[in-house]
């Protein structure tokens, strides 16, 4: 679950590096829905607030700097809007976060599912096995599933090899 994901990031130390996205390659009815949404907002605004909230929960800190860029990749949306964007956020505790979102038939499915956090003591990632398959990037459900969590410990032994094996937590939600 997202609660478990957030909880495990508390074991990583500070500062945190948080990488998340919500890219959706869309066609047909989903492209129509996305175009209609983009008449008033962008993908970065639609879902970005939720991901920033998750980052605030992970850091228990406030954003102090936000940088944003966007690109309009189609003539099918209003001239003042864009269908791809990314945010970079710096928090009071020194943590940093990156979030990107894009909608449309031109969006790549290769890296549409990134939910990844690392700190001095290791990393925690949501791993999408089934939800991350080809043709699933437009599915809202696939972006919110937490099929499994990969917990990597950065501890090294005397030979500077990893002291602990990665832990995979299988989830059903």
Residue positions per predicted region:
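Active-site donor-binding loop signature of nucleotide-sugar glycosyltransferases
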Residues: 20-22, 101, 119, 171
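Contiguous beta-strand/loop segments that form the cofactor/metal-binding neighborhood of enzyme cores
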Residues: 50-136
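Residue-level signal for pocket-adjacent positions within structured domains
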Residues: 33, 38-40, 101-102, 162-164
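Predominantly a Rossmann-like dinucleotide-binding segment in NAD(P)-dependent oxidoreductases
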Residues: 1-78, 85
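A short glycine-threonine-serine/GTX helix/turn-capping micro-motif
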Residues: 39-45, 108, 169-172
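Homeobox/homeodomain signature
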Residues: 8, 34-37, 53-56, 107, ...
């Amino acid at each position: 679950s997202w609660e478990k994901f957030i909880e495990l990031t508390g074991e990583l130390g500070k500062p945190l590096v948080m990488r998340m996205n919500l890219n959706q390659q869309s066609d047909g009815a989903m492209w129509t829905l996305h175009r209609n949404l983009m008449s008033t907002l962008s993908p970065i605004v639609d879902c970005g607030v939720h991901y920033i909230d998750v980052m605030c929960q992970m850091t228990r800190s406030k954003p102090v700097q936000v940088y944003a860029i966007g690109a309009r990749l189609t003539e099918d949306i209003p001239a003042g809007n864009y269908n791809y964007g990314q945010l970079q956020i710096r928090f009071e505790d020194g943590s940093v976060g990156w979030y990107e979102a894009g909608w449309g038939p031109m969006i790549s499915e290769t890296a549409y599912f990134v939910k990844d956090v690392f700190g001095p003591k290791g990393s925690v990632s949501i791993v999408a096995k089934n939800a991350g398959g080809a043709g699933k990037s437009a599915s809202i459900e696939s972006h919110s599933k937490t099929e499994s969590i990969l917990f990597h410990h950065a501890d090294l032994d005397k030979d500077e090899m990893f002291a602990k094996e990665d832990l995979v937590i299988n989830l059903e939600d």
